[in-house]
Amino acid sequence: MSYFPWLTILVVLPIFAGSLIFFLPHKGNKIVRWYTIAICLLEFLLMTYAFCYHFQLEDPLIQLKEDSKWIDVFDFHWRLGIDPLSLGSILLTGFITTLATLAAWPVTRNSQLFYFLMLAMYSGQIGLFSSRDLLLFFIMWELELIPVYLLLSMWGGKRRLYSATKFILYTAGGSIFFLIGVLGMGLYGSNEPGLDLERLINQSYPTTWEILLYFGFLIAYAVKLPIIPLHTWLPYTHGEAHYSTCMLLAGILLKMGAYGLIRVNMELLPHAHYLFSPWLVIIGAVQIIYAASTSLGQRNFKKRIAYSSVSHMGFIIIGIGSITNIGLNGAILQILSHGFIGATLFFLAGTACDRMRLVYLEELGGISIPMPKIFTMFSSFSMASLALPGMSGFVAELVVFFGLITSPKFMLMPKMLITFVMAIGMILTPIYLLSMLRQMFYGYKLFHVPNKNFVDSGPRELFLLICIFLPVIGIGIYPDLVLSLSVDRVEVLLSNYYTK
């Protein structure tokens, strides 16, 4: 057992080191870029070392615990700890954030502030996934809002202020329900407020109160995940944000909602989750069909990919609602799989948009010949997104299918109906993705357009793409790389449902 404060260092290092960016020389961006990359690499290497040498994979309980007095007046503590459920999300955060800083290389305007905001997001994300106190969880949840709002409003597209305002209104509105739930859970049945997750796991509530708490938390997670109809901020945000910001949004920010749904709603409120689970499965199935159908009608290819993300989140919702070992492990696998695939698709869309200065599909065509590397990688990750066998997306969706089919919670006919709806969604996915590829990369439309910078991917971009492609293939061929991390913890979590 390690008593060294590994998690505190991992949470504090990015934002503390990021604040030193403003003391670096103002002339040129090279020093700021390399400094930020070095901080992200150091953070990723530190977390890899800590987890390899101080984390026991076979132990499903909380490890690397830290507990320090924080606000003495209210007896609030700085409580950190990780288990196999949070391990994958933390490693995904380190991996994607490091590559997102590399993707942000072309940013030159106010680069010091830009990279500081990315590092502040990094701290908030690591803090959220390692929090063992509900108040600390909420603070880390809110810490994301300001950096994302500034990244959107200062480095976005023409409608960046509209998309940033929509993002902040939706997420802040959801956070109000989150805060009410935190206060209600902490103050219930006790003269002294206590928000330690270890204590709250053993806390029981009246059925009506538990349902109200569950619904409040669900609204907050439904905004971030997102769950229809609270998803409308996402297409605008992804359509206007810089592609490095999109990588963080699609790769990590959306997964915070899924993680919260498992960590708080499922773990702390099992009775309410058991009652709500059929509705989650229905909403997930409807979301797969709705978002896939809406994606097919989008003229802007960035928004088409954004609706694709909403559709794939439906599989995570179904996996969480299935209340089975297989289904929940499939949801966790889909969280990591879409983190890789979604982030890369937005990176490729952004790099293509930077070169063509066009986003509408009817204006595109014929760019596969001048940009063959972008075409190859875009096609490869589109195949991963549409669940081609041998890639991570296929395994994740297949495991969720099996989880739903084997669920004792549902009768045969509802399971058949939901499975049929999911299958239709999987058919729609290649339709909207392959039609996008055809409109963008085939034909001859752009060959005679003057003043277009048809430059293919350089070494930096290829390195980034290959780094993400390797785990996508690795998980697709050998999914036990991920499943072995979570299977024991999932079994312990679901024991609440079978014993109660």
Curated annotation (Swiss-Prot):
Listed GO biological process terms? aerobic respiration; ATP synthesis coupled electron transport; electron transport coupled proton transport
Which keywords, in A-to-Z order, does the entry hold?
Answer: Chloroplast, Membrane, NAD, NADP, Plastid, Plastoquinone, Quinone, Thylakoid, Translocase, Transmembrane, Transmembrane helix
| MF annotations from Gene Ontology | NADH dehydrogenase (ubiquinone) activity; ubiquinone binding
The EC number of this protein is 7.1.1.-
Reaction catalysed?
A: a plastoquinone + NADH + (n+1) H(+)(in) = a plastoquinol + NAD(+) + n H(+)(out); a plastoquinone + NADPH + (n+1) H(+)(in) = a plastoquinol + NADP(+) + n H(+)(out)
Matching InterPro entries, A to Z? NADH_Q_OxRdtase_chain4 (IPR022997), NADH_Q_OxRdtase_chainM/4 (IPR010227), NADH_UbQ_OxRdtase (IPR003918), ND/Mrp_TM (IPR001750)
Query: What Gene Ontology cellular-component terms does the record carry?
Result: chloroplast thylakoid membrane
Q: Does the keyword Endoplasmic reticulum apply?
A: no
Kindly list the residue ranges recorded as spanning the membrane. 4-24, 35-55, 87-107, 111-131, 134-154, 167-187, 211-231, 242-262, 272-292, 313-333, 334-354, 386-406, 417-437, 462-482
Coarse class of the protein's main subcellular location: plastid
Keyword Electron transport listed? The answer is no
- Its topology with respect to the membrane? Multi-pass membrane protein
Q: Where in the cell is it found?
A: Plastid, Chloroplast thylakoid membrane
Tell me the HAMAP family matching this sequence.
NDH1_NuoM
Q: Which family does the UniProt entry place this protein in?
A: Belongs to the complex I subunit 4 family.
Q: What is this protein called?
A: NAD(P)H-quinone oxidoreductase chain 4, chloroplastic
Q: Which organism is it from?
A: Zea mays
User: Its encoding gene is what?
Assistant: ndhD
